[in-house]
From Swiss-Prot:
The gene is hssl24. This is HssA/B-like protein 24. Belongs to the hssA/B family. InterPro entries: HssA/B-related (IPR008455). It comes from Dictyostelium discoideum.
Length: 91
């Protein structure tokens, strides 16, 4: 897994969908919230209900007054741990 800016690269991608996310191509996956939700950038908790230090650290780096970048851990179809990038409006 390689993190390039706000893009997550999946080393061995498979066709799958998580929580309304969309796969832009075979190598990258991005998830964007359909409506505003509260962001917890310090814990990285959210979509997958997981408290994740890496997600919290990365989440605290992005965004502005009304957008926050948060990373959520997930497991791909191959069993590989990946991080899904999401942007949500902070309230």
């Amino acid at each position: 897994m390689t993190i390039i800016g706000s893009i997550i690269k999946i080393s061995n991608p498979k066709k799958f969908s998580i929580g309304g996310g969309s796969i832009s191509n075979n190598n990258f996956i991005s998830l964007y919230s359909s409506k505003k939700k509260k962001c917890e950038s310090n814990s990285g908790s959210g979509l997958f209900g997981a408290n994740n230090l890496l997600g919290g650290l990365l989440g605290s780096l992005g965004g502005n007054n009304n957008k926050q970048v948060v990373y959520h851990p997930a497991v791909s179809a191959t069993g590989e741990t990946i991080y899904i990038h999401s942007v949500c409006g902070c309230e």
